[in-house]
Amino acid sequence: MTQSQTVTVDQQEILNRANEVEAPMADPPTDVPITPCELTAAKNAAQQLVLSADNMREYLAAGAKERQRLATSLRNAAKAYGEVDEEAATALDNDGEGTVQAESAGAVGGDSSAELTDTPRVATAGEPNFMDLKEAARKLETGDQGASLAHFADGWNTFNLTLQGDVKRFRGFDNWEGDAATACEASLDQQRQWILHMAKLSAAMAKQAQYVAQLHVWARREHPTYEDIVGLERLYAENPSARDQILPVYAEYQQRSEKVLTEYNNKAALEPVNPPKPPPAIKIDPPPPPQEQGLIPGFLMPPSDGSGVTPGTGMPAAPMVPPTGSPGGGLPADTAAQLTSAGREAAALSGDVAVKAASLGGGGGGGVPSAPLGSAIGGAESVRPAGAGDIAGLGQGRAGGGAALGGGGMGMPMGAAHQGQGGAKSKGSQQEDEALYTEDRAWTEAVIGNRRRQDSKESK
């Protein structure tokens, strides 16, 4: 059983925070980096950045869904506290009876990251260590020379700073305390930590792009240019006498080219950026809808034809007080009080046929009619359960008969005449004398009144 606790709640603060948490954050960059040159290592590096950026965007989208779930939980908590306020008001209206429970948080919600996977790794194979000198220079000089990589890096660096500046929404609450508040604040802090980590990964990916761009600049500076190589070859062809001096220069170019290509192949191999899955948001379900109340005890169940009359008898469902009374002038002046008392005691009547009407009326004397003390309401034809009002009415009918009998024995309950004459009871009439229903539920006392327990046994 949940233990009651004192909580501090500002419902509007929770609702405002839900709107804050759910508000869209900055969109990640969508720039696609292109290779700075035609070297295989450069192409692989650019492709790795594309895959990492795509996965970052997918993880960020999953994080947005979790923030929406968190906002929904906050709204559900605020709504629940609103209903708790109503329950508290009801409890106060009920003379302070009843308790109000603090809203508690449930388990985590659904997993929006179920489809997320690690970032694929691109193959790191590059050009062979030996490549034609002029072909290597041509490939190195073809492309945007790292311009798109620099733009890509700038975009993700800016995004990193934007994310870091947008975590205030995950702060704690000023006017909400309790178990649910603690759980929600923990979930908010998890989201904050995850956003900060995604910001760091954004900066790391930007550094990778910057590094490849700088690596390419270094390679261009260290590698012989295509123009230099073509000029050297032309000089070699046109000046046979200078070939002995030209060959060592060409060999040096080749050596420099191989060194640059080796460095490019090794250093351009990037690690994939693998973001963590967003933490699942805390789940607080909406308050259940109010339960529909059944028949209120004391209200009669109307017949199916809507007439308010018991089928087959033409009589109202509640037995009527007999119009005849004692020779002294009918019912006493305090009839209403006696009927109310009788209604309370009627609920305690046993099904024992030995109960006499005098036990209700309080007076002795007079013959007890052999017929049942209830009204003729159709007998076995009535198949519906008796409501509390029926029971109270039954008590009223018996009270009237008892009062008349106590005064002089002249009164007779309605319906008694048609049951037959004589002092002997048949087996069937004895069964009809048995109580059809005994009300013994404490929660109906507000309708039929308080009574002493086990009155039926004491009155025998």
Curated annotation (Swiss-Prot):
Alphabetical UniProt keywords: Acetylation, Secreted, Virulence
Site, as annotated: Cleavage: A358, S359, A386, G387
The protein's GO terms of the molecular function aspect are: identical protein binding
Q: Which cysteines are joined by disulfide bonds?
A: none
User: Localized where?
Assistant: Secreted
Q: Which GO cellular component terms are attached? A: extracellular region
Q: Which residues carry this modification: N-acetylthreonine?
A: T2
- GO BP terms in the entry: biological process involved in interaction with host; protein secretion by the type VII secretion system; symbiont-mediated suppression of host autophagy
For the region Disordered, what residue ranges are annotated?
A: 92-116, 303-335, 405-441
Q: What does the UniProt record tell us about how this protein is modified after translation?
A: Cleaved in the C-terminal region by MycP1. The exact location of the cleavage sites has been the subject of conflicting reports. Further in vitro studies confirmed that Ala-358 is the primary cleavage site and Ala-386 is a secondary cleavage site. Likely translocated as a full-length protein into the periplasm, where it is proteolyzed by MycP1. Proteolysis may serve to limit the secretion of other ESX-1 substrates.
Cite the Pfam families for this sequence: EspB_PE, EspB_PPE
Write down the superkingdom of origin: Bacteria
Stated family: Belongs to the EspB family.
Note in the entry: BTP15, an inhibitor of ESX-1 secretion, decreases secretion of this protein without being bacteriocidal. BTP15 inhibits autophosphorylation of MprB with subsequent up-regulation of espA and decreased secretion of EspB and EsxA.
Supply the domain comment.
Answer: The N-terminal region contains a fused PE/PPE homology domain. The C-terminal region is disordered.
State its role. Answer: Required for host-cell death and may support an EsxA-independent virulence function. Secreted processed form of EspB binds to phosphatidic acid and phosphatidylserine. Inhibits IFN-gamma-induced autophagy in murine macrophages.
Subunit comment? Mature EspB oligomerizes and forms donut-shaped rings. In contrast, the full-length protein does not oligomerize. Interacts with the C-terminal region of EspK.
Its name, as the record gives it, is ESX-1 secretion-associated protein EspB
Q: Which organism is it from?
A: Mycobacterium tuberculosis (strain ATCC 25618 / H37Rv)
Q: What is the name of the gene encoding this protein?
A: espB
